[in-house]
């Protein structure tokens, strides 16, 4: 059975709000009020916005600069590529802040004889979790600064931009962050020991907040093929992009 979008009314201003299947939070595009889809009640967490700084006319110029600086892109890519489509999307993120501490025990095998070793890894994190379930967005490659965030205002969203809603609860986001941080600390521990015998990680959450951040989704063409690029709308840097390879020629 195909899931069908529904519609509810904003509990703050009464505007009609289309709800896509799977969305559990919805932000009104008229007044900026965020509510829980199931109950219609007000959202209890801080909701922030990172502003887009790139006018539409400058987006492809930023991509061309990235092309010119690439060591693997064809030399004529910036001149011969053409823009097919670009869309500004405000992606929803949960920001899970807190301190994580791991205690590890392992075997250090880089000396002879090998010796047992243990230690601690402690770091503070503002861990970003994309609040969408069916996506392969490279969140760990997205180095977003939270310094420029402001309280969410619908009037700050550009006309034509799309604001995606959350498909993930705060509780699920915390568990997701906890799992990813545990995996990160296990990776860091492997730099200290060659074989991990035991590792335990404790993540103390101090704050959970909700955030929308601007990302340009762009498609360009080169030699009859299409390629995708994701561009950070806040600072104009490429998050991830596809590049065509150089044609191989015999000398």
Could you tell me what each predicted segment is?
Residues 5-7, 25:
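Residues immediately within or flanking Cys/His clusters that coordinate Zn2+
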Residues 10-13, 28-31:
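Short cysteine-rich clusters marking metal-coordination/redox-active sites
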Residues 44-229, 241-251:
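Charged, low-complexity helical/coil segments in non-catalytic cytosolic or luminal regions
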Residues 20-23, 38-42:
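Short Cys/His-rich "knuckle" micro-motifs
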């Amino acid at each position: 059975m195909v899931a069908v979008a529904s519609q509810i009314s904003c509990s703050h201003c009464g505007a009609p709000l289309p709800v896509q299947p799977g969305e559990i939070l919805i932000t009104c595009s008229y007044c900026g009020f965020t509510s829980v889809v199931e109950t219609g009640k007000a959202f209890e967490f801080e909701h922030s916005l990172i502003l887009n700084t790139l006018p539409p006319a400058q987006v492809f110029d930023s991509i061309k600069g990235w092309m010119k600086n690439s060591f693997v892109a064809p030399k004529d890519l910036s001149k011969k590529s053409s823009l097919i489509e670009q869309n500004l999307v405000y992606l929803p993120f949960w920001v899970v802040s807190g301190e994580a501490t791991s205690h590890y025990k392992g075997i250090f095998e880089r000396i002879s004889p090998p010796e047992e070793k243990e230690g601690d890894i402690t770091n503070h994190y503002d861990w970003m979790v994309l609040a969408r379930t069916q996506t392969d967005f490279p969140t760990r490659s997205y180095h977003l600064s939270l310094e420029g965030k402001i309280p969410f205002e619908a009037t700050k969203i550009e006309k034509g931009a799309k604001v995606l809603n959350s498909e993930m609860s705060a509780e699920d986001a915390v568990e997701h962050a906890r799992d990813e941080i545990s995996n990160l600390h296990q990776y860091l521990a492997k730099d200290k020991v060659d074989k991990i015998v035991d590792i335990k990680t404790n993540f103390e959450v101090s704050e959970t907040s909700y955030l929308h951040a601007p990302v340009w989704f762009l498609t360009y063409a080169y030699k009859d093929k299409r390629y995708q690029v994701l561009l950070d709308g806040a600072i104009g840097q490429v998050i991830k992009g596809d590049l065509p390879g150089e044609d191989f020629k015999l000398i």
